[in-house]
């Protein structure tokens, strides 16, 4: 029995009841020794062939052999058939065509004079009047020849006068610069001032600079000392056990509890409420699903069909 408030083994597995036994005393048959068509081996209804796929072969048709559509018939003209249908439709007419008792009603709206008092006005008649033959007017007088293009590449076609030609030297800019440079050197009074000494700053960058050479650096000779091996002042302390080698003394034993115990613990004798378990279900596989799984699989889903009873 499980502890109070626990679950049973069946509930822990996930089932709420023990599964029923499928067979009683039947021997196990491996899947290799089983028949290919289990339903046919048990004298059950055999499944017919599946749905036919559309193809050019004879299996794609419903008849066992190909049947001609117009076998034993002559050539038929579509116009002849159409006229024959028209004659048969005309025979169904009982009398002449229906004629209304009154004449056709004229429209009374925009552009119509039906229903007006005066009728149409002859001045606004829609009849075309005879006209004289059209004579094209002559060309305008030309005071100047026609302009050519937009002006680029053509002379004397703009509003203003054409600019007069003025010759310019090839090196005009170079000659102007040379002339200005000569005028600048003419205004100078003499050669630029040049100091005959090496340029130096007002003050030396190094304030501790001295022209005298410094004496050589004296190196102190160090005496070689022979170091002895290190020996500890006291032996090493062992961990655990004896605490005589520690810095602090071992605390004395005290029987007093760290926390005062309570005389009565609340809730220890109270019973835990467990609600009664209701009806529980277990997973059940449908018989229809099992039948579909056996009859329809990945190999025969194209050729299988619904059996008729």
UniProtKB/Swiss-Prot annotation:
Detected in testis and fetal liver. It comes from the Eukaryota. Pfam families: CFAP96-like (PF15239). GO terms for cellular component: 9+0 non-motile cilium; centrosome; cytoplasmic microtubule. Belongs to the CFAP96 family. Keywords: Cytoplasm, Cytoskeleton. It is found in: Cytoplasm, Cytoskeleton, Microtubule organizing center, Centrosome. Disulfide bonds: none annotated. Residues 220-249 are annotated as: Disordered. This is Cilia-and flagella-associated protein 96. It comes from Homo sapiens. Its main location: cytoplasm.
